[in-house]
From Swiss-Prot:
A motif (Phosphatase catalytic core) lies at residues 487-498. It is found in: Vacuole membrane. PROSITE patterns: SAC (PS50275). It comes from the Eukaryota. Component of the PI(3,5)P2 regulatory complex at least composed of ATG18, SAC/FIG4, FAB1 and VAC14. One of its GO terms (cellular component) is vacuolar membrane. Pfam families: Syja_N. Keywords: Hydrolase, Membrane, Vacuole. The keyword Nucleus does not apply. This is Phosphoinositide phosphatase SAC4.
Amino acid sequence: MTSSPSVENGGSGSSGSSALLGCMQQFKLFETQANFYMIGWNGSGVYRILKIDRLEASELNLREDSTAYTKKECYELLKRIHEGNKATGGLKLVTVCYGIIGFIKFLGPYYMLLITERREIGEICGHIVYEVSKSDMIALQHSSVLCNTANLRDENRYKRLLCMVDLTKDFFFSYSYNIMRSFQKNICDHESGGTLYKKMFVWNEFLTRGTRHHLRNTLWTVALVYGFFKQTILSEAGRNFKLTLIARRSRHNAGTRYLKRGINESGNVANDVETEQIVSEDVPVDRPMQISSVVQNRGSIPLFWSQETSRMKVKPDIVLSKRDLNYEATRVHFENLVERYGVPIIILNLIKTNERKPRESILRAEFANAIDFINKDLPEENRLRFLHWDLHKHFHSKTENVLALLGKVAACALMLTGFFYYQLTPAMKLEGYMSLSSSDADTSPHNSSDDDSRDYDSLEKNCRPSKNVANGDYDVKPSRLQSGVLRTNCIDCLDRTNVAQYAYGWAALGQQLHALGIRDAPTIELDDPLSSTLMGLYERMGDTLAYQYGGSAAHNKVFSERRGQWRAATQSQEFLRTLQRYYNNAYMDADKQDAINIFLGTFRPEQGSQAVWELRSDSHSNGRSGEISMGEDEKFLVKRCLSDGNILHESHTPMSAMSRKNESISHRGFVSSHQVTRTHIISESSPDMPAAGDVTLSRCTPSMPSTHFFGDVQKVQHNGSSSIYLSEQEDMSSVSNFVDIEWLSSSENLCENDHLSRPSALTIYSTAETSSSENIITEVKQLTPAMRESGSSSRKGKEPVETELSVHTKIRDDFPDSFKQWVAYGEALCH
């Protein structure tokens, strides 16, 4: 025997917590000609042995020794194994490792993926978080066993593809903390064992499935999360605190920029990322620790759309599918968000409104249609809240401070959702209150939908105030829960989205520090050093997520301008990033997508079947059925479909008189689309897109905003919400049902050193305390005389604006009769 187990460093990373002492964190892999032997040990000095068969390498055959050995007993056992295999070379040390990533099979034998080097990147409540520094792939089949050479070429190509998933970049894990879940869920909903591997943020769920099935535990594997993790220690008013920023990328509908767009039939969107911001006191282990977290979400626009990868176009045309007429997949997506985060779901949509050639604006109009259609079937308190806000337009307006405006939106969203606050006592930390248990049996069959989507109400009931576990003479503050989430998107959910997510994190940080008693005020000014530090973290996170999905760092024009960076240097940097993103999307993403599909088990190689590189089926798989390409030469008949329920549709039947859907409503108020008859759609987009010029869809007509029809209306009635607030500008760049646009736009001349505060002209009530969204926004008219006079000139001298629209609404007299007829009866407008 050339080596024997040694544990001089076996206790690395352990602490006094019983949970940390119980989990195995270091392993040694030995081999004979017939078997692999993996030895694992924990901080308590308990040794275990896993035996892996090598003779039948086409089948995964694992056996765990149920005996718990001491160090001496384990050494003696290995010595006997060595003596019994001397004739074939004995027992040899292969490698020291830190956990099994999983097992995978292509066309030949199984391979074992191991973590061979790790690096500590942070800790949460005493639980250490690591990133993968080095990994290795080892064939189970011994080299002396004959292999099938017919498939050797394809086998090697599959191995090269898998290696394209670089496990040393942005993969992190913890042995004792459920890093795949938010802090709130870890406190309130105690899940453990194999069920945690089925969560949507565990990227090696498929690779570990066989191990969990055979062993009924997760002692030997680690759950890898893909995304971003960064922790830093900061000081404020002489008190230290830890700021942790985590991004968890979903494994569902995962892939690259142009090959994964929109939504799939299961309601999973591309580029779905959960971002968590944790603030915790930096205190000794024997003192109670206050901790706060807030979660937000980003994800592709939940419609069936795609873009054709092109080597000739930097910005390919958008393809919008017509197959989901009742927005069933979109409804399922938002239903899943409600189950994961509770209500309200707040949508911040940042895509463009005005374009010479309609691209983003097509999706903006259709997304508005989908939200309105879904909201019709929801109880008032569960309806989707939204703000359509053209960030590109507002950024190029020299009178506006984009970060300050987004900060005001974030403050409004925070008042609706709240954030999580908890106080951990020393006993809870020492006993591993949030620990990951690896001994629970994983006996349930695999279900791809078995994700972190439990009913939020049950989670809330399970979360007990920390006073129930308090001990000693400590004053324990009451806990807080976050209910609901802010969901942000642009087209790629990278550049503009990251700016908005920083604004939300900035607004939340002040609230979190105030809750911890570190700051007296719940706000932080933009020029505060804390804001700059936080901006650096979000900028780094944005670059990381952009590399993963888009192939280059993020476009950070807003951040660069905020830092006062030389504009010419910024433009040069942005141009280079555009070229890098274009090259990767056009030339590299196909292989990268194949690699991701193999790693996640989306594609499984089989002998006699087509290879993954022969299919290339991911290209626009979300938009094949019934897709309509937005080419320049195609022209469509434009219909005007307004959102008012009394406007007639093509059959001349008032929509309000049509038979309503089934009254049965699910526990969250979401109704399945097969129970619904689609009655109307809304449309809003760029006013400068001609009806017979640029192409559009009849379902998402780029038409004039409602202010063109009914004068300068600021508040209109929708079927999906009690009140919709529009911008005074005629480009419809801002539309919302939870933020008053007039109040928001009153900040156009906001000074950069203005800070977030609870707006005096805005009162937001919790969704649990309101029965109508009318009550969400009040007192919005407390404006200065100058602001009242700053509206459009056409508004002066007119009658007071009505807040509800109906067929009796007076249409402006300067429109021709044919146009009035079209508005009143919903017919197609032809020239």
